[in-house]
Each structure stands twice: as C-alpha cells, then as structure tokens.
Amino acid sequence: MAKEKFDRSKPHVNIGTIGHVDHGKTTLTAAITNTLNTRYGTGAAVAFDKIDKAPEERERGITISTSHVEYETPNRHYAHVDCPGHADYVKNMITGAAQMDGAILVCSAADGPMPQTREHILLSRQVGVPYIVVFLNKCDMVDDEELLELVEMEVRDLLNEYEFPGDDTPIVRGSALQALNDPAGPWGDKIVELFEHIDTYIPEPTRAIDKSFLMPVEDVFSITGRGTVATGRVERGIIKVQDEVELVGLQEDSRKIVVTGVEMFRKLLDQAQAGDNVGLLLRGIQRTEIQRGQVLCKPGTIKPHTKFKAEVYVLKKEEGGRHTPFFDGYRPQFYFRTTDVTGATKLPDGMEMVMPGDNVTMEIDLIHPIAIEEGLRFAIREGGRTVGSGVVASIIE
C-alpha cells in the first residue's frame, strides 16, 4: 500500500494527552480520532485497543512505550502522542522523544485531580510544554453541577500553582466514552468544542528556521590560504555569507566572528538553514581558538552558564543504566549537543540518594560554561555510557 502524501497546506501542531492513570487519556485519544473523522471526514478513526497497545521505542537507549496518532480539524493537522504508563510519560517528557506544543490534561470529574495530575502538570512546567487545555472527563457520571464546579476550581488552582494561567485555561466538560460510542451526538459536540479551543488557544509553533541562528560545532579544521572551517548541523535559523556570529561556550568570554563562506556537500552556498549539515568559513580565528562543544549563534541570543536546575530521569539497570543509587555530589559527565562536560549534582533537601528508574529535580554545577537555555536536553554519562537523561528547567547562573 502506497504511503499517503503528507498534506503540508495546513499548519502542523504536536500535541499529547496527559493526566492520572485511568482518567481516560487513551479513550479520549480514540474519541478524538473518531469524532473528527465523523464530523469532518478528515484523518482516520483509530480504535482504543490499537492506541492502548503502544509499541516500545528506544530513544537515547531508554525504552518508552508511546502511541502516535494523527488527525485534522478544518484548520490544522495534529500529531498526537499518548503513553500507556506513568513511567512512559516521565521518560517521554524528559528525553523530548515526543515534543509537545501543547497538552490536553484529562481529569476525571468523578475523582478530581489525583497525584499524577499534579505530577504531569509539574513535568509540563519543568520540560517546557507551553500550553495546557483541560478536558474534564466522565461528566456523564456526575449529576451534581456544584461538584463539577469544585473539580474545575481545583484544576485551575493546580495549574496556577505551577505557573500556568489556570484562570484563563479553557476547560471542556465531556465524556470520552460517550463520544467514542456516539461521535455524532451531543457528547461528540464536546470533542468539537475542545478542538475549537485547542485551535485558538495553542498557538502555531515557531518553526526552527524562523528562530535565531544556532549551530553546535562538531569539528574544526583549517584550509591553507582560506582560514578556519567549523562544521556542524544548523539547529535553527538561517546563516548567510558575511553574517556576524558569536562563538559561545567552554571559555569565559564569547567572541564575534564573521562568516565568509558557507559550504555544503563541497559546494559553496549563499546561505544555509535549520537541518543543513554545513561547513562555515570563519574569518580571523585560528583553528586552536575554536573547539567541538562550542556553538556559533546570532550575537546576543544565548549565553554560557555553569549552574542550572534540571529535571532528570535515571536509567534502570535493564536500560543499561547504573545498578546502584548515587548520592549528593555525584560527578558524572553531562553531554550537551556535541560534548561532555563534568559537573557536580546537588539533590533536593531531604533526599539522600537517587535510585535507578527515579526521576528527580536537581541542581547541576558544570566545571566549564556551556551555551545553555531552558528546555535544552542532555544526557548523563559515565565513561561514555548513558546513565540518565535530563532537560534544563531553569538557569541559576
């Protein structure tokens, strides 16, 4: 069967369901595909058990089960991720295996917010999920209007607690199961209403090409008579010949350099963009003054830092991680973009140790400054093998 051509005419948004176990995330995912297919004739209906049997994937050596479905509203194309287990969410969000432009928080009206409701909101805050829309599920089981209002208030308070705009967050009351059984009926209307909110409340993501230029340096060599060339894959933005860039990381001071040539597959170009593997010819810098692990970027857009807070997942023994816990002051290597830097870890107050399989918020102090920003992913390594995965939650200095 030939693959269908991906329709690029609609804006594309990545989304996912989050929330406590058994509050109806997977049922909602199935109901969405079914309802949008019934109402608009777009996409395909995906059955519950097909989503529930999520295939295992390995992302940076970590085993994660995730289901990917896609669907369309009249305005947009969505890629949606749903995870069967809580551990899969934690791993997924920390490794960035499934980047989310926004999330649908599913909360059962019958139970109200539960521990994982809170944990998923916190994780969303830490890993930089920018927008959350709430689906209050199982409303067919609750007759009491006051109870619904109470649950709604609790959810809003919880969102506020983790610095999401709880008071302005769209909350839709519905029943995923009823909508799945009768997508054309009144409960199906609730799914349509949910997506009217999502279409407007979750903005289109900025494409990598529209962001400020950044390229991690992978290799450096000098060409006699022409100068120094730095190679790497452009992470974001566009670079043109004669642009000024800044070299950031591994040294105290950043310095500005002019790009005098852009080369790709041995051909000279006027410009390169996000996703391209290129060599940049740099004027007035010696090969010894630039090294792997630094980044070239638009001047002033990123700074070198040594101290930051991170959300970390520690690999289990079965995933090739450590067999033993580690303690406060543990000093592994932190692998950012293209290089390892040693750093010391500081555990939260009152926490003695971290076991393989745990996720933890910790402070990290690197021995060299690195170009870091919130949302940047990294691996934790010991002697070249990955023992953990993390994401920068906030910069300290």
From Swiss-Prot:
Q: Catalytic activity annotated for this protein?
A: GTP + H2O = GDP + phosphate + H(+)
Checking SUPFAM superfamilies in the record gives: EF-Tu/eEF-1alpha/eIF2-gamma C-terminal domain, P-loop containing nucleoside triphosphate hydrolases, Translation proteins
Domain spans labelled tr-type G: 10-206
Does the entry feature the keyword Transport, yes or no? no
Q: Which compartments does it reside in? A: Cytoplasm
Q: What does the subunit comment say?
A: Monomer.
Full protein name:
Elongation factor Tu
| UniProt source species | Alkaliphilus oremlandii (strain OhILAs) (Clostridium oremlandii (strain OhILAs))
